[in-house]
Regions:
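Rhodanese-like catalytic fold shared by cysteine-dependent sulfurtransferases
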Residues: 1-104, 130-169, 183-203, 212-328
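A conserved helix-loop-strand patch within extracytoplasmic ligand-binding domains
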Residues: 104-109, 117-118
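A short acidic-Thr-Gly-centered motif at the start of a beta-strand
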Residues: 115-119, 197
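Short hydrophobic beta-strand that contains or immediately precedes a catalytic carboxylate
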Residues: 124-129
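Aromatic-flanked redox-active Cys/Sec active sites in thiol-based oxidoreductases
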Residues: 209
Length: 328
């Protein structure tokens, strides 16, 4: 079994027609996963037999709009999705903001990024993912804007601009930017402080899992006065396949049944997160079983069962939904 991840921003004249075609194609090949179709393009995650996925990619490439799509592939023991969904959306990634993607950041290839990091070049690695993804794993010394969802990205950029005369003290818990205490060597040794005027003149490289979010993020940064902006081509998954674990720590969160994976198919990385209950190193990620909470959390098998699938003892006490299946 294999898993593929792909996207392309391109004008789609008849999204509903494409949605129907994609559902028919994926269904005929027994593929499972999610495909989002919008006027701005296509975004998909699928799992299936290698032969069937090969046929899918071949059929997709017959459409000239998609002939140059770069697929991110991975090996899986079983299907990484439970059902097939092909949905019509306003966007192929939920952002709630419009940008001119013709003015997006330049691509930087994974091997080019590795060389920069090997040589200790002064670059800003900006993680465009959500908090729980960043917490599970990230590039060493990467900056994160404390995003609960990608929709908050414009607001966080405005916060930077609105405070361009104020430096952020990263010794406080309510910082707007996370994890800067570990970045002093990358940030010209400016101890615990960063601001808009400093950031906008630096080489910023945005990254996300597969590229679909950092493409929009890079364009938004450029619209807001950050000129030297790049995006990691193919995202974290392509970097891991080509460069291994170099300059990476932890796992990579993926939106399927695997939860978190190693970015290097040939080696395992140590978890940088802890079980919420026993506090031992762990990267097994779950959704809280309490529907009113539903947040992601990490827990080992034993503690997951003790918590009845919830993220905390409090949520366990308020659990209203039917009992969840315990892990064997």
């Amino acid at each position: 079994m294999k898993n593929i991840l792909f996207y392309k921003y391109v004008d789609i004249e008849n999204p509903e027609k494409l949605r129907q075609e994609q559902f028919k194609l994926a269904s005929s090949l027994n593929l499972l996963g999610t495909i989002l179709v919008a006027k701005e393009g296509i975004n998909g995650c699928l799992s299936g037999n290698e032969k069937d996925l090969k046929e899918y990619k071949k059929a997709l490439a017959k459409n000239k709009k998609f002939s140059d799509i770069k697929f991110k592939e991975g090996i899986a023991k079983n299907h990484t999705f439970r059902k097939l969904y092909v949905r019509l959306r306003n966007e192929i990634v939920s952002s709630k903001f419009n940008v001119d993607l013709k003015n997006k950041g330049k691509y930087i290839e994974p091997k080019e990024l590795k060389i920069l990091l090997d040589n200790n070049e002064k670059v800003i690695l900006l993680d465009a993912r959500n908090n729980y993804e960043y917490d599970i794993g990230r590039f060493k010394n990467a900056i994160h804007l404390n995003l609960d969802t990608f929709r908050e990205f414009p607001e966080k950029i405005k916060e930077l601009q609105g405070n361009n005369k104020k430096s952020y003290n990263t010794d406080k818990n309510n910082d707007k930017i996370k994890n800067l205490n570990n970045n002093k060597n990358k940030l010209d040794k400016i101890s615990n402080k960063i601001n808009y005027e400093f950031l906008k003149n630096k080489k910023i490289i945005t990254y996300c899992t597969g590229g679909v979010r950092c493409e929009k993020a890079s364009a938004l940064l450029k619209e807001n006065g950050f000129d030297n902006v790049y995006q990691l081509h193919g995202g974290i998954l392509t970097y891991g396949k080509e460069c291994g674990n170099a300059h990476w720590e932890g796992k990579c969160f993926v939106f399927d049944t695997r939860g978190a994976i190693d970015i290097d198919p040939n080696s395992q990385s140590e978890p940088i997160t802890q079980c919420v209950l026993c506090h031992l190193p762990n990267s097994d990620i779950h959704n809280c079983a309490l529907t009113t909470c539903d947040r992601f959390f990490t827990a080992c098998r034993d503690c997951f069962n003790v918590l009845k699938g919830c993220c905390s003892k409090r949520c366990r006490g308020e659990l209203l939904k039917k009992p969840v299946e315990m892990l064997n």
